[in-house]
């Protein structure tokens, strides 16, 4: 009987304990005039932002696992590709009243989403959401085609309590990114052949000079090359694990 009781108790504890992955997530916290902003890397391009009692989920896509994290008040999507959206995860991370904001190209598939295009702004509660360009300059699957056409997907600048957070989406070293101003935290992609090299990403980051830069969507890129490229600029580089095992 004692052994059965022990097994039962252990099973119950395991059921209610957060997963190892949830416990080990490298959560980042940033200050704003409206209170702290907590950002949780989930996987690849998927992340969760919490501030003021509200939750924003960005690019919910498999194999991201949101176990132990709250469901979204807002889901923000950057592009049509499968590493940026998955209908089953969008449903799983939604609750009553969840809003979805996405580029018009995504709205064709995610029909409950509200569209936002490059250059447009929306106010969502205490947040300002600005859609900015993300696209390829030269890289594509074949001559005359690009992986990401200009205007199809969105990068985003999210502002809360005066703190400005940039999400690059899938992009190369484009003029619009280089011209960004007053970015506090930048999430910048890099991986070939779809976006850019670490060296190109570093060159872009040096141009708009955020206070903090966090590489994401990096796959097997050499992050040391990115760090080397940004060294000596005064920009803080935070290298996080976006590809947890298990």
Sequence positions of predicted segments:
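Positively charged n-region of N-terminal signal peptides that target proteins for export
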Residues: 1-4
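Bacterial N-terminal signal peptides
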Residues: 6-16
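Sec/Tat signal peptide C-region and signal peptidase I cleavage site
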Residues: 18-22
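Core dinuclear metal-dependent hydrolase active-site scaffold
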Residues: 23-70, 115-181, 240-246
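Active-site metal-binding motif and surrounding structural segment of the metallo-beta-lactamase
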Residues: 61-109, 181-187
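Active-site environment of divalent metal-dependent phosphoester hydrolases
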Residues: 64-66, 81-85, 107-110, 120-123, ...
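Binuclear metal-ion centers of metallo-dependent hydrolases, dominated by the metallo-beta-lactamase
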Residues: 114-125, 150, 202, 206-246
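Proline-aspartate-enriched helix->loop->beta-strand connector
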Residues: 183-188, 192-215
């Amino acid at each position: 009987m004692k052994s059965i009781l022990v097994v039962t108790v252990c099973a119950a504890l395991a059921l209610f304990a957060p997963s190892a992955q949830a416990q080990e997530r490298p959560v980042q916290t940033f200050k704003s005039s409206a209170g702290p902003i907590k950002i949780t890397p989930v996987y690849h391009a998927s992340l969760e932002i919490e501030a003021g009692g509200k939750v924003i989920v960005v690019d919910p896509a498999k194999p991201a696992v949101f176990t132990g994290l709250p469901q979204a008040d807002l889901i923000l999507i950057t592009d049509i590709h499968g590493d940026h959206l998955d209908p089953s995860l969008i449903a799983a991370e939604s609750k009553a009243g969840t809003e979805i904001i996405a580029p018009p190209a995504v709205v064709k598939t995610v029909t409950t989403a509200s569209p936002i295009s490059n250059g447009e702004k929306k106010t969502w509660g205490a947040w300002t959401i600005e859609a900015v360009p993300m696209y390829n300059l030269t890289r594509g699957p074949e001559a005359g085609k690009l992986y990401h056409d200009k205007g199809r997907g969105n990068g985003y600048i999210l502002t809360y309590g005066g703190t400005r957070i940039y999400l690059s989406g899938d992009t190369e070293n484009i003029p619009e990114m280089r011209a960004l101003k007053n970015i506090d935290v930048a999430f910048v992609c890099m991986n070939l052949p779809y976006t850019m090299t670490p060296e190109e990403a570093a060159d872009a980051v040096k141009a708009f000079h955020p206070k903090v830069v966090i590489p994401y969507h990096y796959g097997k890129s050499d992050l040391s090359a990115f760090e080397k490229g940004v060294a000596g600029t005064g920009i803080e580089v935070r290298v996080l694990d976006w590809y947890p095992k298990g």
